[in-house]
């Protein structure tokens, strides 16, 4: 399949992913590159799984691999590797020595969902805690109920 959408991987990008994740090279009905393209399309556009364009493999297959790779932290490995390469090119250590922590309260959920009230913001919902390095590259993310303060988040 040729490149159809702007989110589709180039051959060089795909070779890097294959090498980094040590993906098995065996005959498959659907190319893993097309499955990755489907995941990237979904992440970029925010569409629902069932609305994945027909140019990609069936949504169930793309979802299966997304869950599998998420469980085995393959995306974390890939992002960590890319972050290290860019940091080295900028003359920095491969791994960050410190991070910047911030949080944001968000309205979310219904009466049955685990949420609480952030006393400072007067928001009932959840709180996103994010750690980035000095370049703004993501290091860690954690979601808690809104009343957890940044010092207790243990991100």
For each predicted feature, which ranges?
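Short alpha-helical elements
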Residues: 1-154
């Amino acid at each position: 399949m040729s490149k159809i959408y702007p989110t589709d991987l180039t051959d060089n990008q795909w070779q890097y992913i294959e090498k980094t994740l040590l993906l098995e090279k065996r005959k498959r009905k659907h190319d893993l590159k097309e499955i990755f393209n489907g995941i990237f399309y979904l992440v970029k556009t925010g569409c629902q799984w069932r609305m994945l364009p027909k140019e990609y493999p069936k949504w169930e297959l793309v979802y299966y691999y997304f869950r599998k790779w998420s469980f085995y932290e393959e995306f974390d490995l890939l992002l960590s590797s890319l972050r290290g390469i860019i940091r080295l090119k900028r003359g920095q250590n491969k791994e960050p020595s410190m991070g910047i922590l911030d949080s944001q309260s968000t309205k979310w959920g219904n009466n049955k969902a685990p949420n609480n009230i952030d006393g400072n913001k007067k928001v009932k919902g959840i709180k996103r805690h994010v750690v980035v390095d000095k370049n703004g590259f993501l290091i860690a993310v954690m979601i808690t109920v809104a009343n957890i303060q940044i010092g207790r988040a243990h991100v």
